Amino acid sequence: MNVQRELDFGHDDRERIYDYVERHGECAFADLETNLRVDPRGIRHHVAILRRDGYLEVDGDAIEVVFDDGTAEEYRDGEVEFVVRPAHQSDLTGLIGAIRQVAEEGRYIEAESVADVIDHEEVLLRHNELEERMFFVATVGSDVVGWVHVAGSELDKLQHTAELTVGVIDNYRGHGIGSHLLERGLEWAGSRGYEKIYNSVPASNDDAIAFLENHGWAVEATREDHYKLGDRYVDEVMMDVRL
């Protein structure tokens, strides 16, 4: 198991509180008091300690898990101004919408799967001793227009690897948003100790293959007729990059 995923809370009640927040993405103090077998008088103290130790962040009554993920970065390309930043639970609806908009083009099957998972779980970020999942988003104003997603493996022998998906909605392509998202995702993956990052796309998605190759990725393998898009069978192109 990666060192980064070994969590030490120092108290059983703190572990229960962290686990609850991590599973739900965001919660309020009232949720903890109602749903946990923890002395209500101690909850605010334990949250304060978890906040001090860098496990949780508190904004008003909202409690979220903390990732060591950096800050928002602003960019401009021509008339387009955008921000790349860590995703928050409040981005869930906009992020799912952006991923599904890209997936509807029928050329990014893995992205569609990611949208299904977070839509079902209703949780964006995961950080526990079995699973790690991070999103960064690109926003124009308050709208999510792109994302990068990094998810580690649950298997011990694959914990040096992580899957990455990245996408930008059609109207905002060509402004370097995808490149900034990819760079941010790979930086984060490297900081978490991952060594090999992989992605898979249909062979018909020439743009995605060229984009990744232009950023140092290589074709690792091809699985023939792996996807069925309508009446047509399409190969899966498996790509990776080493950090």
Model-predicted regions and their roles:
Residues 2-5, 51, 55-90:
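Conserved N-terminal entry element of GNAT/NAT acetyltransferase domains
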Residues 30-31, 182, 189-201:
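Conserved GNAT acetyl-CoA-binding A-motif
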Residues 113-169, 242:
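Acetyl-CoA-dependent GNAT
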Residues 166-168, 174-191, 210-214:
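Conserved acetyl-CoA-binding loop-helix of GNAT-fold acetyltransferases
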